[in-house]
């Protein structure tokens, strides 16, 4: 094997490594987007459950019926779990976005309320 063949193989290997690195970066971004969407949907689901419970309670009051006791929603626990998993729980445009390991004072304020 001569020098030009070795250099060509090395250049091809470098190009392949760069392509794999680029693909890995794209997959990482896509994974973060999917996880953020999942968190947003989980939070929306919790909000909808709360809304449904309020509707059922108001209808029961109108009809004079008693509702069976349900366990209260653990909203704070859910928010704490999401924050621990690395997502913003503060109000605003960061809500549901990945924190990338940094603490957020706004999120901590939400948890302390």
Swiss-Prot record:
NCBIfam families: PRK13169.1-2. Binds 1 zinc ion per subunit. InterPro entries: YabA. It is found in: Cytoplasm, Nucleoid. One of its GO terms (cellular component) is nucleoid. The gene is yabA. Keywords: Cytoplasm, DNA replication, DNA replication inhibitor, Metal-binding, Zinc. Belongs to the YabA family. GO terms for biological process: DNA replication. It holds the Pfam family YabA. It comes from the Bacteria. Homotetramer. Interacts with both DnaA and DnaN, acting as a bridge between these two proteins. This is Replication initiation control protein YabA. Its cofactor is Zn(2+). Involved in control of chromosome replication initiation. Inhibits the cooperative binding of DnaA to the oriC region, thus negatively regulating initiation of chromosome replication. Inhibits the ability of DnaA-ATP to form a helix on DNA; does not disassemble preformed DnaA-DNA helices. Decreases the residence time of DnaA on the chromosome at its binding sites (oriC, replication forks and promoter-binding sites). Tethers DnaA to the replication machinery via the DNA polymerase beta sliding clamp subunit (dnaN).
């Amino acid at each position: 094997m001569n020098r030009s063949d070795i250099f060509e193989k090395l250049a091809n290997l470098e190009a392949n490594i760069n392509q794999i690195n680029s693909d890995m970066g794209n997959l990482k971004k896509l994974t973060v987007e999917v996880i953020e969407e999942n968190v947003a949907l989980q939070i929306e689901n919790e909000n909808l459950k709360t809304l449904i419970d309020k509707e059922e309670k108001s209808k029961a009051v109108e009809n004079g019926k008693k509702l069976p006791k349900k366990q209260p929603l653990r909203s704070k626990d859910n928010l704490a779990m999401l924050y621990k998993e690395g997502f913003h729980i503060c109000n605003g445009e960061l809500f549901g976005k990945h924190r990338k390991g940094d603490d957020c004072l706004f999120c901590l304020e939400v948890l302390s309320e």
